[in-house]
Amino acid sequence: MADFYQILGVSRDADANTLKSAYRKLARQYHPDVNKDPGAEDKFKEIGKAYEALADPETRARYDQFGEAGIGGAAGMPDMGDMGGFGDLFETFFNGFGGQSSQGGRSQRRGPQQGDDLRYDLNIDFKDAIFGQQREINIPHLETCEVCRGTGAKKGTGPTTCTTCGGSGQVRRATRTPFGNFTQVAECPTCNGVGQIISDPCTSCGGNGVKQVRKKLRINIPAGVDSGTKLRVSGEGNVGLKGGPPGDLYVFIKVKNDSNLKREGINIYSEISVSYLQAILGDTVDIITVDGKVNLKIPSGTQPNSTLSLENKGVPRLGNPVARGNHQVLVKVKLPTRITEDERNLLEDLASKYTEQNSSSNSGLFSRLFGKDS
């Protein structure tokens, strides 16, 4: 791999002026319009790549430390903004005097162009995200002007050929440089590269050929979507130009929170409080789920902060609604702050019997249940 300093013929401590002087000298020597040798164009590109890497202080520092790998192979032709407009001139040479840019060519601007994609943010309820729904939305987008049918010209008229460029969309001018006289190709300033001008614009769209209108769409929200889910509605973006295809509409989902339920992925979480008697003896309680109220069995001896699961009561998996997650219920046990005399007598009697049956244990009934010694 060639060293950039060697390519330019300078030392590694060369300053910016030395680099520029060396580059100009070599660029003139190897420019393919001046030097007809078979390898001149490749050499000219190599010189440009080396100068671009070393002309920028940050890029040069990375190159000095890591070599060409440190600049990611991103070096190409240098920014010629401070060299009297040579950049546009060299761009013309490398594209065969066709007036095409490195982004694909001005000729493409005159052909069909795809319309822009659009974004629409949609807030939906918690349950609607679980089970899906159809929603009607109203979006603003660009459509072809019905009056001029997209021409931009007043009805009964049409675009005319640009007299400045003769319909080519490009203008040429002679430029004197240290390399000699060259012809520079640029976008026509009169028609902006289109090749046609509209003398009598359409009053409905102002000569643009498109108008912003609001359109009602009915979209299908699949079961299992979540905040951040992006839905693509094909062909509902802005209209394309000159017969190009329309863009797409992207609907970004934002799911509202629920006061009782929380969601993590395909599972749903909630809490329930039961009395200490329900925890000890067991019970059946009603639980609010996305499917409505369902019965949840509290097994006898349920410990505080344990989790019980309702299978297949969670969120359908996006793209496979038959497969659902679970609803996880965190059980909180409520301890009474006050008890009646009768309740105390019953509990003490129970504690006494429990202690007799478990005399070898160092802890009593209340210790096991509530963390207190009996």
From Swiss-Prot:
Family: Belongs to the DnaJ family.
Region annotation (Disordered) ranges: 99-118
NCBIfam families for the chain: DnaJ_bact, PRK10767.1, PRK14293.1
PROSITE patterns registered for this protein in UniProt: DNAJ_1, DNAJ_2, ZF_CR
Encoding gene, per UniProt annotation: dnaJ
Keyword Zinc-finger assigned: yes
GO molecular function terms listed in the Swiss-Prot or TrEMBL record: ATP binding; heat shock protein binding; unfolded protein binding; zinc ion binding
Subunit structure, as described in the record: Homodimer.
Domain (J) ranges: 3-67
One of the protein's GO biological processes: chaperone cofactor-dependent protein refolding
Entry protein name: Chaperone protein DnaJ
List of residues binding Zn(2+) 1: C145, C148, C202, C205
InterPro entries for this protein: DnaJ (IPR012724), DnaJ_C (IPR002939), DnaJ_domain (IPR001623), DnaJ_domain_CS (IPR018253), HSP40/DnaJ_pept-bd (IPR008971), HSP_DnaJ_Cys-rich_dom (IPR001305), HSP_DnaJ_Cys-rich_dom_sf (IPR036410), J_dom_sf (IPR036869)
Segments annotated as CXXCXGXG motif repeats: 145-152, 162-169, 188-195, 202-209
Binding site for Zn(2+) 2: C162, C165, C188, C191
